[in-house]
Amino acid sequence: MKFFNREKEIEEILHIIESEPQRINFIFGSINSGKTALINEIINNRLNKDKYVVFYFDLREIFISKYDDFIEVLFEEYEEPFIDKVKRLFLSLIKDYPDVIKSYALLNITGVVDSIPIPKNTLNELLKKRNVKNVFRYITSVLIKIKREGKQPIIIIDELQKIGDLKLNGFLIYELFNYFVSLTKHKHLCHVFCLSSDSLFIERVYNEAMLEGRCKYILVDDFDRETALKFMDFLAKENNINLTNEDKELIYNYVGGKPIDIIYVINEMKYKKLEDILTSMLKEETQKLKYFLENVKEEDEELYKKVVDALKIFKDSYEIEDIKIPKKLREFLVKKNILFLNPIEGTLKPQSFLVWNAIKRIL
């Protein structure tokens, strides 16, 4: 399927990439709002592969519980050519020697890659010493080599919050943030983009004193009504489906501007009635919310009452000011993916129109 819209966000991100690295860039939004699709469109179709080298680390489907997992995500080992081994051994005997080794693996990095090449023996050393500073030192050396070849390195980490609680002499995430600040604000060496649908993680970052003035936040939200209707027309044409204005309004009233939900509806329309599709989707979301509330009630009657009172606020409004719901309660509802928090704007809303409609139906 062709990529649709997001020209405003694309223009903003390309402007960042074409400028000198200055800040850590956080791309955030509700679940399935199109963050990954956006960044993939940019790195695969909008960048000159001869000018940029993108290291794209997708943590979405990777279980990371220890240091070794983190290292394996970052690096891909290769056998170091014999001549490089000899050079490194010889130069290691010379004090303050310049970095002149140019590995074939490093010189041939181009376009988008999902790991950083590393000699097998170097990787073994990193795993053995378990010192994150050595890891960052090696990455920096790779980035410098790329820069010397006239290319701009870019690091992208999708779902960064997955290492948020990983400890290695303190929380690894803080070591990583310090390193990213060094790469961007201090050395101006590499662009850094972090994607996340975890709005509590973004709130934690936003309130982190060490990152003040060192980050930029880019919201990739669900489509607004006008864009959502155009997206439906786009998909209908792609799939040779006839959509009336009434059909489009009905779809929007059920699923709003959530791209993945609109795509699902249009695909299902190839062999199902629109009303049946939407009724089924809302029924499923309503059942999930009903069982969630049932579980809360069984575990804590008092919490259940507070949750119900909080969700009732959304019967009349899709979006509210965040402080209308007490902090611990809103964090609970955000963690359970019922609500989405935008800490930059200070707003709360259901994760999707489907969730919103389920809230209104149950309460």
From Swiss-Prot:
GO molecular function list: ATP binding
Residues that, per the record, bind ATP: 29-36
Swiss-Prot/TrEMBL keywords: ATP-binding, Nucleotide-binding
Source organism superkingdom: Archaea
InterPro entries per UniProt: ATPase_dom (IPR011579), MJ1010-like_2nd (IPR049081), P-loop_NTPase (IPR027417), WH-like_DNA-bd_sf (IPR036388)
Family: Belongs to the archaeal ATPase family.
Record-linked PANTHER family: ATPASE DOMAIN-CONTAINING PROTEIN, DNA-BINDING PROTEIN-RELATED
Protein's name according to its UniProt entry: Uncharacterized ATP-binding protein MJ0632
Source organism of the structure: Methanocaldococcus jannaschii (strain ATCC 43067 / DSM 2661 / JAL-1 / JCM 10045 / NBRC 100440)
